[in-house]
Amino acid sequence: MKLIASFSIFMLMSIWSFASLGQSNSFDSLFSNEPEFLKVDQAFVFDYVQNGDQLVVTWDIADDYYLYQQQFKAVSKNASLGEPIFPTGKMKEDEFFDEPQEVYYHKVSVTYPILQSQDDSAVKIRYQGCAEAGLCYPPTTQVVYLNAVNASDDLSNTDEASVESSGSVSQQFELADLLTGDQSLIWVLLIFLALGVGLAFTPCVFPMYPILSGIVIGQGKSISTSRAFVLSFVYVQGMALTYSLLGLVVASAGVQFQAALQHPIILGALIVVFALLALVMFGAWEFQLPSSWQEKLNGVSNQQKSGSYLGVLLMGAISGLVASPCTTAPLTGILLYIAQTSDLLLGFSALYALSLGMGIPLILFGITGGKLLPKAGAWMNIIKVTFGFMMLAVALMFVERLVSHMATDILWSLLGLVTFSYFYVMNQASSVTFGKGVRALVIFIGLFASAMYGYQTIFGQTSSVAGHTEQSHPRFEVVKNLDDFEQKLAAANAQGKTVMVDLYADWCVACKEFEKYTFPDTQVVDALSNTVWMQIDLTDNTATNIAFQEHFSILGLPTILFFDLQGKEISGSRVTGFMQASAFAAHAKNIL
């Protein structure tokens, strides 16, 4: 309902339209799932030896596992290596590549000629392999150290050289490869800038648009394009800096920080703020600084220009802090990298580029919005009221984290009815044109959809519940603490059952979507028929919950874990972010 209402409003205003919204499973290819597994250092046992001017690197490969020849890469510092000497492998058709790949089974040795090296010269060896059953590992790096080897006469003096194999990398490993590989910083930033542009068309960034629009509108009808650009750019800088700094905090604090921001008191304050902003847009009251303050700012800041920039920067920072509840795959990948390494500079830079990419459409929207603002007449009021409804929609996004699904669904229905009713009245007052007919059609569709959504919520609830009685998922076993979890896990394994652990919080919208749409589905219930369902409530920042987060290395919610019959978490099985029932059922069948 909320997406339909928002989309219809945007069509009426002809400002922008949202791209199709994918669920977290659009990034599912970044994470592999495999029921039986070995750790990467067990699947591919690494060893090396230096024989004079040759470095021989060897891998003992477990049965039913293999390494890709084209994924071997060596980067040396204070040394120079020649072209690697590979043995002949086997050609394999692999779903992750467009053409057959040469792979190695059981054991492989690769020889690197050492053209020149110093004592303790370092060489980073990177490799990547898969299991026949379907699990593929991210690229893995080992560091080896060399003894001194004198350079040949025809060798040019160089401090650093690299020998690498060419070949495509499957999409599953692209993000990990960007951060762990040796691409230039500029290339990494460009990639994440592009990812950010894609994220700009998701619900995470939706609240930014009405906020930025309100800032542009607040500058008056005579705002210039350059002024609109500067305001939009400053706003985006505030947002980008917030995401970058927040990312570093989240990487170290995990869900604790996210939970603090989602405390009911803070959410309630945000709801009030956006509701008041909506009233301002409706013209119910004026929001401005006291006249004495305005006079001082006018005198010091040349009619508030500097003050406005600072205010816009702060608004962008606050917006980035409170209006992005989603945990996306690119953001999660960067945060995991920061948390597991000491390379904060690269992590911060990648986060900033990602955030800046998210801001590019915002800047374009701010400029376009400034141009499209009516110079005079009744349409100015219609635009302001429209953004008022958008402010209410943002407030509702926070409300749904505090109340039941049924209550929020009814509120969405009412908001849609009120919004489209207002547009109906305004459209009736306009002159008869082709555009009026088109607007009327969109308005009636919006009214009908809003009414049906509310009807289905109120009167369809009973039949919906009744229809799912026999398909209700097993009752979750509530886990109190880590000791309780270990006991319940052991008890489940003793019964020959695997375990699924749902980590959720009351403020987590996607957690509620799992509960409403995914868990009750027949496919999911059948796929987890021999699995004990456990649940950990991370709503509050208690010492017990912090221990859970640290023990399981939780970055965001929802997170769902799977444990095998030996009580170990299944490699690559974690689900982060909402997943639809069919995809979740397939995921469960693949790993259990």
Curated annotation (Swiss-Prot):
It is a multi-pass membrane protein. Its EC number is 1.8.1.8. It is an enzyme of class 1 (oxidoreductase). It catalyses: [protein]-dithiol + NAD(+) = [protein]-disulfide + NADH + H(+); [protein]-dithiol + NADP(+) = [protein]-disulfide + NADPH + H(+). Residues 1-19 form the signal peptide. SUPFAM superfamilies: Thiol:disulfide interchange protein DsbD, N-terminal domain (DsbD-alpha), Thioredoxin-like. Its main location: membrane. GO terms for molecular function: electron transfer activity; protein-disulfide reductase [NAD(P)H] activity. InterPro entries: Cyt_c_assmbl_TM_dom (IPR003834), DsbD_gamma (IPR035671), DsbDN (IPR028250), DsbDN_sf (IPR036929), Thiol_diS_interchange_DbsD (IPR022910), Thioredoxin-like_sf (IPR036249), Thioredoxin_CS (IPR017937), Thioredoxin_domain (IPR013766). Residues 443-592 form the Thioredoxin domain. Disulfide bonds join 130-136, 204-326, 508-511. It is found in: Cell inner membrane. Keywords: Cell inner membrane, Cell membrane, Cytochrome c-type biogenesis, Disulfide bond, Electron transport, Membrane, NAD, Oxidoreductase, Redox-active center, Signal, Transmembrane, Transmembrane helix, Transport. GO terms for cellular component: plasma membrane. One of its GO terms (biological process) is cytochrome complex assembly. The chain crosses the membrane at residues 186-206, 229-249, 265-285, 318-338, 345-365, 379-399, 406-426, 440-460. Belongs to the thioredoxin family. DsbD subfamily. Required to facilitate the formation of correct disulfide bonds in some periplasmic proteins and for the assembly of the periplasmic c-type cytochromes. Acts by transferring electrons from cytoplasmic thioredoxin to the periplasm. This transfer involves a cascade of disulfide bond formation and reduction steps. This is Thiol:disulfide interchange protein DsbD. The gene is dsbD.
